[in-house]
Amino acid sequence: ACVHYPVYEQNEVDEKILSLEEVIEITHSKNKPVSVDAAGQIYPLENFGKYVKMGADFQCIAAKYMGAPHSTGIALGTKDVIDTIARHSFVGYESRRIRGIGRPHKIDRQEIIGVYAAVKRWMSLNHEERLSYEESKTLNIVNDIKDIEGLEVKIIDNIIGHQPFGLNIDIDSKKIKSNNLDFVDVLKNSEPSIWTRVPDGKDTIEIHVFGMTLDQSKIVGKVIKEKLEGLMI
């Protein structure tokens, strides 16, 4: 058994939730390990191994956010934990006396090479240029729709983690014949289809540009503008 702790450094701190330091202290006092879900904490680079240095026994990072295959990730932790994880291996499964655990969930050699290449590239990447590129995609959308009457547009200025920049939009139903939830469906049924959402606990439509090209961001801005202008009261 262990205590699993998710980390979202880009979010505001919830004072009602125990801090990672407190969780580590309490859990270790009971001689149990702490694992940290740091899936999207790929930037700043100091986050690699940060939570283990804080005292956690293990942290996992999703490699897909760095360009590796979708099903892959990397593990950072104490020697005991990493040695245990290594037993989840399919190498020599048919012939070893101690067979690997989790064979149905294996990843193949090509994916492992993909993770290595993605992490190596990520560590040497010019992140200022990367963030500037993400901001440019955001501005492509914002500039198309910012002057539409009845629409409030706010840029997401976060640069931490795997989804830098993006925008939130809020529809005034008194001026536009739609609302945020309905407009999500309008975009989903548009051509091309654009998938957005109103996240749980929030009221506005959230649009992230992670994974888009510059040209695709221009298309998104154009479609949103056309759909909104067609719904003006």
What are these regions (language model features)?
Residues 138, 210-211, 230-231:
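Short amphipathic alpha-helical patches
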Residues 102, 106, 110, 114, ...:
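C-terminal alpha-helical cap/extension of soluble enzyme domains
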Residues 123-157:
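Conserved PLP-dependent catalytic core of the aminotransferase class-I/II
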